[in-house]
Amino acid sequence: VLSCDGNFGNLVFDNKKIPIRGVIGDQQAALVGQGCFKSGDMKSTYGTGCFLMVNTEDKPIVINEGLLTTVAYKLNGNVHYAIEGSIYSCGNIIKWLRDKMLFFKSAHESEKYLNINGDTNNVLFLPAFNGLGAPFWNSDIRGGFYGITQDTTINDIVTSAFNSISFQTKEITTILEKYDIKINNLLVDGGMVQNKTFCQMLSNALNKEILTPVNVESTAIGACKVCMLSSEIDINNLSKEMNSYRPDSSLQDVNLTNFDNWKSYVSKSIKTI
């Protein structure tokens, strides 16, 4: 077993040897790509599903509330550990709203149906197309809406779907903070973060600053950084340009109430299985 920045041999191409100087898992690569090298640095990748990972440096912290302890990487002879939470349904929810419900023609178009303040007129969405991931780990539960009336609009339904993604993220960060893992901001990447309204909603729900890189391909950048470190090339000159989303303090109480209502709906749904 080698370090991420070890010597993995050579790839022979056109009679030339190309050295392989870096190997790292995809989510760990995104962690490195986002520059999460210190304890409490956290990234979240929003694609079909969502993968959150927070660096705990040389301390393998065990959390017995549905989150996983894993190795982040070994670089420069130093092993860093991480805590990971996996959310099963994110981008596939938006795809379902587009392809099955026919609410909009493109994922980009979904943004205009979002209420940036998170208001859904009491509609809640359980995002369990394939069960629930962290921290619930329930493969039997299935998705559903609650609170729909004859006055419910497409905006309410679409916003409730996006809220469910934010609330799953908040559930994980809340558990982390119970274990004294301080998270000042969240660095996010993946296809969904192109939706600026979602990023602001996520910031409001978590009551934390959300940072998105201008180049959202953090996994590829992370793998490149590992190879650069192995080749003794300075990574500090790489672009660190970020977009920032700060929470709207006037919505804090409303978002806490919405989150608590969503948690109650999820808990009751799990109990009925």
Model regions and ranges:
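Beta-strand segments within the central parallel beta-sheet cores of soluble alpha/beta enzyme folds
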Residues: V1-C4, S44-Y46, E109-Y113, S160, ...
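Activation-segment/catalytic-loop signature of the eukaryotic protein kinase fold
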Residues: N117-T219
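Acidic, glycine/GT-rich loop-and beta-edge segments that sit at the periphery of enzyme/chaperone cores
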Residues: L102, S230-I273
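ATP-dependent carbohydrate kinase catalytic cores
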Residues: V1-N78, S89, K105-K112, D119, ...
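Short beta-alpha connecting loops at secondary-structure transitions
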Residues: K74-I83, Y146, L206-T212, K240-L251
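A conserved active-site cap/scaffold subdomain adjacent to cofactor or substrate pockets
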Residues: N76-L102
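Glycine-rich phosphate-binding/hydrolytic loop that grips phosphoryl groups
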Residues: A30-G33, I87-Y88, N163, Q200-S203, ...
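Hydrophobic alpha-helical scaffolding
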Residues: I18-G22, I83-I87, D99-K100, P135, ...
